[in-house]
Design a protein with these regions (language model features):
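Conserved MFS/SLC helix-loop-helix module at the cytosolic interface between two early adjacent transmembrane helices
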Residues: 88-125
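Cytoplasmic helix-loop-helix junction between adjacent transmembrane helices
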Residues: 133-172
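Helix-to-loop junctions at the C-terminal end of transmembrane segments
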Residues: 91-101, 313-328, 416
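Juxtamembrane intracellular "pre-TM" segments in multi-pass secondary transporters
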Residues: 23-37, 216-256
Length: 447
């Protein structure tokens, strides 16, 4: 494999103490290696797209599916928190395991679990089956950190934000087309049908990954399962210990704290969105009926599609030039402020009697803010650790995001029952706190 840069330390610079200033010819990239990296990125995009397409399919109908089993708004959002609880527990496990055995087997096993979870959801006959399906799917879908580690494996640090932007674009496309499929089939044939479609997409995803995805993390770079040569700390796969280890790293801790605050605020919106739409825009006598649920699912689909379009535009095409011009720290600040503005506007809707189009416009602002914040945060996080810890640290990052999605939804339902604006108002306040915390973040290239 050709060497693209001269390496003299973690930052890739030439070792200090070398006084020879004569020009040095850098080896040209190996065309075969470049082609391999592009292939891996393409397969990762396909895998993520199918994964998020399946997840997006269920989004418009999931709250109303749970309500059909007698769940209240508080229970609906707690079920969402249980899904994130499994991701919090399992994301470091998947990430650390991928550092030890490779990315490919971890991705294949996790997709298989997700498929089983979606199947149980599709055939659920009681609320306990609904909850069990979300726990199993959460266990399987805790693999985002591993997928991000694949991106980190095959991209140079200077291109990391672009690679993470591709991850975001796959998210956007999944959230664009998934809710359309879920909204159409759910409104016609019932809420269980989108779950079965999600199971089929997970099965297709498994076969695509099995036949197309090569290993990106070679054996010589893998972390041993035991302490190397009897020295150094043992790296835990358990979330609290792994999080403790990550928080001890000065370059990582500010990113994780900021990400937690951002995630709690954002997840308040995610958990409350469909129920807010139902209470704000579905009027009596349809409200609370099957027809009202279908109308709310359709309107929620429109919001999610709008978010998906905006996310694809920002993360698929704008993130690289924005990073080059403003830098990732500036994008973190701008992203948090944009999301806060969108949330504050949404919280004001019940008091302003604005039409549904205002809800769509505000979510474009939210998607734009999240679209620059998330890939910038992931890029900074991945560049803050050595190559052999990419999977572990990105798994911890996903675990922190999952912890946020436990805290936020656990409050969202109860807050929404007090008043539908409260989750969005609190979310806006937390996003402003996250904006302030961006001042503590340091770019590894400039430390």
């Amino acid at each position: 494999m050709a060497v693209e840069t001269l390496r003299g330390g973690r930052d890739g610079g030439i070792a200090s103490g070398v006084n020879d200033t004569s020009p040095v010819a850098l080896p040209l990239p190996d065309p075969a290696d470049v082609a391999r990296r592009k292939k891996i990125m393409g397969v990762v995009f396909l895998t993520l797209f199918l994964d998020l397409l399946g997840f997006g399919v269920i989004l418009p109908v999931q709250p109303f599916y749970a309500e059909s089993f007698g769940a209240s708004a508080t229970v609906v959002t707690l079920i969402g928190a249980s899904y994130s609880l499994m991701q919090f527990i399992c994301a470091p496990l998947w990430g650390r395991l991928s550092d030890r055995v490779g990315r490919r087997p971890v991705i294949l096993v996790s997709i298989a679990f997700a498929c089983v979870g979606w199947l149980i959801l599709g055939f659920a006959q009681a609320l306990w089956m609904f909850v069990a399906s979300r726990l199993i799917a959460g266990f399987g879908n805790a693999n985002l950190g591993t997928v991000q580690a694949v991106v980190a494996d095959v991209t140079a640090p200077k291109d990391r934000a672009k690679g993470m932007g591709m991850v975001g674009a796959a998210f956007g496309l999944g959230f664009l087309f998934g809710p359309i499929i879920g909204g159409v089939f759910g409104s016609r044939y019932g809420a269980h049908v989108p779950a079965l479609i999600a199971a089929g997409l997970a099965a297709l995803n498994w076969f695509a990954a099995y036949f197309l995805l090569p290993e990106s993390h070679p054996a010589e770079k893998r972390t041993a399962a035991v302490v190397v040569d009897g020295h150094g700390p043992r790296r835990s796969i358990f979330p609290l210990q792994a999080l403790k280890e990550a928080l001890a790293m000065p370059s990582v801790a500010p990113l994780l704290v900021m990400g937690l605050v951002f995630g709690v605020g954002f997840s308040l919106m995610e958990a409350a969105l469909s129920l807010f739409v139902e209470r704000q825009f579905v009027l009596p006598p349809a409200f609370g009926t099957d027809a009202g649920h279908k109308e709310a699912a359709y309107l929620s689909m429109l919001v999610l599609v709008t978010v998906g379009v905006a996310a694809v535009i920002v993360q698929g095409g704008l993130i690289r030039p924005l990073r080059a011009r403003f830098g990732e720290r500036s994008l973190l600040l701008a992203g948090a402020i944009l999301v806060a503005v969108g949330f504050a506007g949404t919280a004001a809707l019940p008091f302003l009697s604005l039409p549904f189009a205002a809800m769509l416009a505000l979510n474009v602002v939210v998607a734009a803010g999240s679209g620059v914040f998330s890939p910038s945060s992931s890029s900074l996080l991945s560049r803050s650790v050595p190559d052999d810890r990419q999977g572990a640290i990105l798994g911890v990052g996903q675990s922190v995001a999952s912890l946020a999605r436990i805290i936020g939804p656990s409050m969202a339902g109860a807050l929404l029952e007090l008043h539908r604006s409260i989750p969005f108002a609190l979310g806006a306040a937390l996003l402003l706190v996250a904006a302030v915390l961006t001042r503590k973040v340091r770019d590894p290239e400039h430390v």
